[in-house]
């Protein structure tokens, strides 16, 4: 009020498009008065629609695809840090397109029964070795990064992703609980695998290039298996099915829950080759809800990380 004090009331209307996802969408709106002395932040929450544009929306959408790289490694392996570096470079070249697991074997101090089972499945005898989507084997050399990238692109060129996953995870005492749903578009034979991984595990690592490292930060270490390590088999009789799974595993002594994440991948049987390949892979920190992810509109709200004053998208 000019020349004095008082209160001005104001209002505005927001019109949004229908929510085509199967998740609640959240956006943040910041409102600031002209002289910037007063501001308010409003959170807008939009429920999903029912029917074909709600619960069934996933059927007409294209799943976002990520490849899975199993990096077979060991703490005594002096060449293994080089492959880890090449894999990191490949991830930088293909942002948010590669999920990884560091599969320790060969007597490594970080070896588990699950990692031993994976090494047996893929016949691993040499370290390091990379296996991409269960299809391609990559050795350690000066072309490792390029081979990983080309293998990831080869999977996407050959197969359309027909699986998606969503889940919630929670901690109860020393247990991590996982409530998981797999969304499958095509009838066929499948396997689902879920591991509890730990990042930033400080332990020695032999390194022929940079010298042995007593405090190497190991990431993507398998700590526990929610499922059978080689995958829990299931069959989809008709197109468009949802399979639900419920698991709980104990956090190993000495592990830090804040450094742990859940990784899930779905394998599909290729009827032409009688071989399973990784159709899609996903990961999220323990306690973080994983939503279905689509190519067409991103995933979740489309406004993750939006701060007051930034643009929002509905």
Q: Where are the regions that the model predicts?
A:
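C-terminal edge beta-strand
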Residues: 36-50
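Surface-exposed binding patches on compact interaction domains or structured appendages
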Residues: 1-15
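Short, conserved sequence motifs used for protein processing/export or organelle targeting and
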Residues: 89, 96-293
């Amino acid at each position: 009020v000019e020349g004095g004090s008082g209160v001005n009331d104001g209002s505005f209307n927001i019109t949004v498009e229908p929510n085509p996802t199967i998740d609640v969408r959240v956006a943040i709106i910041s409102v600031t008065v002209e002289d910037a002395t007063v501001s308010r932040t409003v959170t807008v929450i939009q429920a999903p629609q029912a029917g074909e544009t709600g619960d069934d929306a996933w059927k007409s959408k294209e799943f976002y695809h990520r490849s899975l790289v199993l990096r077979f490694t060991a703490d005594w392996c002096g060449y293994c840090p080089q492959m880890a570096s090449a894999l990191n470079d490949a991830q930088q070249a293909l942002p948010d397109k590669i999920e990884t697991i560091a599969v320790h074997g060969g007597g490594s101090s970080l070896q588990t029964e699950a990692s031993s089972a994976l090494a047996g499945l893929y016949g691993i005898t040499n370290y390091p070795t990379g296996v991409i989507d269960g299809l391609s084997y990559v050795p350690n050399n000066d072309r490792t990064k390029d081979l990983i990238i080309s293998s990831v692109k080869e999977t996407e060129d050959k197969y359309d992703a027909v699986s998606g996953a969503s889940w919630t995870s929670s901690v109860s005492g020393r247990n991590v609980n996982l409530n998981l749903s797999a969304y499958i578009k095509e009838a066929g034979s499948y396997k689902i695998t879920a591991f509890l991984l730990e990042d930033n595990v400080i332990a020695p690592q032999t390194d022929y290039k940079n010298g042995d490292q007593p405090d190497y930060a190991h990431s993507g270490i398998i700590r526990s298996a929610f499922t059978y390590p080689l995958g829990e088999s299931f069959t989809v009789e008709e197109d468009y099915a949802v399979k639900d799974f419920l698991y709980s595993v104990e956090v190993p002594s000495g592990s830090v829950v804040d450094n742990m994440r859940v990784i899930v991948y779905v394998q599909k049987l290729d009827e032409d080759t009688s071989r399973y390949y990784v159709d899609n892979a996903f990961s999220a920190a323990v306690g973080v809800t994983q939503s279905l992810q689509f190519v067409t509109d991103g995933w979740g709200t489309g406004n993750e990380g939006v701060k007051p004053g930034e643009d929002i998208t509905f």
